[in-house]
Amino acid sequence: MSIASITSTAQGSATVLDGKALAKQIEQQLRTRVDAIKAKTGRTPSLATILVGDDPASATYVRMKGNACKRVGMDSIRVEMPSVTTTAELMAKIYELNSSPDVHGILLQHPVPAHIDERACFEKIDLAKDVDGVTCLGFGRMAMQQSAYGSCTPQGIMHLLEQHNIELAGLEAVVVGRSAILGKPMAMMLLNANCTVTICHSRTQDLESHIKRADIIVGAVGVPELIKADWIKAGAVVIDAGFHPTDNGGVGDIELQGVENIASAYTPVPGGVGPMTINTLIRQTVDAAEKAAGLDNS
């Protein structure tokens, strides 16, 4: 999809970027790869998830990731630590998982209790097992277009765009949000795809004017429906990475009502970006297991 085709898309014909359906297709491929790893090594690819404390939302996310592992035949190693865990104790657990040949990927569930130095703990994850793309070294390698596992949500978004044959080169991209795990890596991935990228955030003046010129918009700011539908220009690609529960299910960071009559393509909420985030985590863990088994062809 070129700039010309984006700007000329007829109203009402927007493509729904269905992350749930794509993730299901990819899982079938991953199961075949997992079986091949088992056949060669006798080991089952495994993802270790570390949950510190008893936050219900975090526990739900960890359970969802464990279920995704099971669907492709992987092992899920759930490490639960009490909320009084110290930074040193958490680092010791990460070192233990780093050294285990039975662990191929490590995920430290965000957020950890406030007294723990989360960033310092992220940095202790072995780069070869950083399948959630949280280390500074991994980010730097990704930014320089070297081999690394990308942060899962932006990497999942890029895969979703690729699978729908959306050509990004030359597009004006606006990323709303600058978090270390979403906004910043998203902007860098789009830059590496030859977009002209603007990053907007809480101090941005006149957000509307930036949105109105965007060929591709990524809502990654964590504010319900901050970006209004009438700001979106005709034919834009709309990616909503937010989710905020409501009585009717949930909304994202972008007002999606009527967007099918404006955009050329958009992600639904829910069912767009979320499934691709977890799918990317599993896919990158399988990648790591293949590398450990000498099956990587890249």
Curated annotation (Swiss-Prot):
Its EC number is 1.5.1.5, 3.5.4.9. Keywords: Amino-acid biosynthesis, Histidine biosynthesis, Hydrolase, Methionine biosynthesis, Multifunctional enzyme, NADP, One-carbon metabolism, Oxidoreductase, Purine biosynthesis. NADP(+) binds at G177, R178, S179, S202. It catalyses: (6R)-5,10-methylene-5,6,7,8-tetrahydrofolate + NADP(+) = (6R)-5,10-methenyltetrahydrofolate + NADPH; (6R)-5,10-methenyltetrahydrofolate + H2O = (6R)-10-formyltetrahydrofolate + H(+). It comes from the Bacteria. Pfam families: THF_DHG_CYH (PF00763), THF_DHG_CYH_C (PF02882). Disulfide bonds: none annotated. GO terms for biological process: L-histidine biosynthetic process; methionine biosynthetic process; purine nucleotide biosynthetic process; tetrahydrofolate interconversion. One of its GO terms (molecular function) is methenyltetrahydrofolate cyclohydrolase activity. One of its GO terms (cellular component) is cytosol. Pathway: One-carbon metabolism; tetrahydrofolate interconversion. Catalyzes the oxidation of 5,10-methylenetetrahydrofolate to 5,10-methenyltetrahydrofolate and then the hydrolysis of 5,10-methenyltetrahydrofolate to 10-formyltetrahydrofolate. Belongs to the tetrahydrofolate dehydrogenase/cyclohydrolase family. Homodimer. This is Bifunctional protein FolD. It comes from Psychrobacter cryohalolentis (strain ATCC BAA-1226 / DSM 17306 / VKM B-2378 / K5). The lineage of its organism: Bacteria, Pseudomonadati, Pseudomonadota, Gammaproteobacteria, Moraxellales.
